[in-house]
Amino acid sequence: MVKQIESKYAFQEALNSAGEKLVVVDFSATWCGPCKMIKPFFHSLSEKYSNVVFLEVDVDDCQDVAAECEVKCMPTFQFFKKGQKVSEFSGANKEKLEATINELI
């Protein structure tokens, strides 16, 4: 399941409550074509990797979160462990997304 993040507080809360689990964050926008293309794949990964926390942040709805995470383009995927960013990349690259998850879990 992918959790939709609505605020900076909710983002921080999700990172904190993940504990030892890997957190994968999809920074996207409704008007972004590549974001729409990879969204179903991102959701399917959340079913496949039940021990990983998947979050979705709409950069227009949560501009403060996007700014704090220094998101410059969409989609950007960031990976967190114990509240710390451990990896990130931009672009709708399905293979890289799954490979990065496998590398970090």
From Swiss-Prot:
<dbReference type="InterPro" id="IPR013766">
    <property type="entry name" value="Thioredoxin_domain"/>
</dbReference>
<keyword id="KW-1015">Disulfide bond</keyword>
<dbReference type="GO" id="GO:0005634">
    <property type="term" value="C:nucleus"/>
</dbReference>
<feature type="active site" description="Nucleophile">
    <location>
        <position position="32"/>
    </location>
</feature>
<feature type="modified residue" description="S-nitrosocysteine; alternate">
    <location>
        <position position="73"/>
    </location>
</feature>
<keyword id="KW-0964">Secreted</keyword>
<feature type="disulfide bond" description="Redox-active">
    <location>
        <begin position="32"/>
        <end position="35"/>
    </location>
</feature>
<keyword id="KW-0539">Nucleus</keyword>
<dbReference type="InterPro" id="IPR005746">
    <property type="entry name" value="Thioredoxin"/>
</dbReference>
<feature type="modified residue" description="N6-succinyllysine; alternate">
    <location>
        <position position="94"/>
    </location>
</feature>
<feature type="modified residue" description="N6-acetyllysine; alternate">
    <location>
        <position position="94"/>
    </location>
</feature>
<feature type="modified residue" description="N6-acetyllysine">
    <location>
        <position position="3"/>
    </location>
</feature>
<feature type="site" description="Contributes to redox potential value">
    <location>
        <position position="33"/>
    </location>
</feature>
<feature type="active site" description="Nucleophile">
    <location>
        <position position="35"/>
    </location>
</feature>
<dbReference type="InterPro" id="IPR036249">
    <property type="entry name" value="Thioredoxin-like_sf"/>
</dbReference>
<dbReference type="GO" id="GO:0005576">
    <property type="term" value="C:extracellular region"/>
</dbReference>
<feature type="site" description="Deprotonates C-terminal active site Cys">
    <location>
        <position position="26"/>
    </location>
</feature>
<feature type="modified residue" description="N6-acetyllysine">
    <location>
        <position position="39"/>
    </location>
</feature>
<keyword id="KW-0249">Electron transport</keyword>
<keyword id="KW-0010">Activator</keyword>
<feature type="modified residue" description="S-nitrosocysteine">
    <location>
        <position position="69"/>
    </location>
</feature>
<comment type="function">
    <text>Participates in various redox reactions through the reversible oxidation of its active center dithiol to a disulfide and catalyzes dithiol-disulfide exchange reactions. Plays a role in the reversible S-nitrosylation of cysteine residues in target proteins, and thereby contributes to the response to intracellular nitric oxide. Nitrosylates the active site Cys of CASP3 in response to nitric oxide (NO), and thereby inhibits caspase-3 activity.</text>
</comment>
<keyword id="KW-0963">Cytoplasm</keyword>
<feature type="site" description="Contributes to redox potential value">
    <location>
        <position position="34"/>
    </location>
</feature>
<comment type="subunit">
    <text>Homodimer; disulfide-linked. Interacts with TXNIP through the redox-active site. Interacts with MAP3K5 and CASP3. Interacts with APEX1; the interaction stimulates the FOS/JUN AP-1 DNA-binding activity in a redox-dependent manner.</text>
</comment>
<keyword id="KW-0813">Transport</keyword>
<keyword id="KW-0676">Redox-active center</keyword>
<protein>
    <recommendedName>
        <fullName>Thioredoxin</fullName>
    </recommendedName>
</protein>
<feature type="domain" description="Thioredoxin">
    <location>
        <begin position="2"/>
        <end position="105"/>
    </location>
</feature>
<keyword id="KW-0007">Acetylation</keyword>
<keyword id="KW-0804">Transcription</keyword>
<feature type="modified residue" description="S-nitrosocysteine">
    <location>
        <position position="62"/>
    </location>
</feature>
<dbReference type="GO" id="GO:0005737">
    <property type="term" value="C:cytoplasm"/>
</dbReference>
<feature type="modified residue" description="N6-succinyllysine">
    <location>
        <position position="8"/>
    </location>
</feature>
<comment type="similarity">
    <text>Belongs to the thioredoxin family.</text>
</comment>
<dbReference type="InterPro" id="IPR017937">
    <property type="entry name" value="Thioredoxin_CS"/>
</dbReference>
<dbReference type="GO" id="GO:0015035">
    <property type="term" value="F:protein-disulfide reductase activity"/>
</dbReference>
<dbReference type="GO" id="GO:0009314">
    <property type="term" value="P:response to radiation"/>
</dbReference>
<keyword id="KW-0805">Transcription regulation</keyword>
<keyword id="KW-0702">S-nitrosylation</keyword>
<dbReference type="GO" id="GO:0043388">
    <property type="term" value="P:positive regulation of DNA binding"/>
</dbReference>
<dbReference type="Pfam" id="PF00085">
    <property type="entry name" value="Thioredoxin"/>
</dbReference>
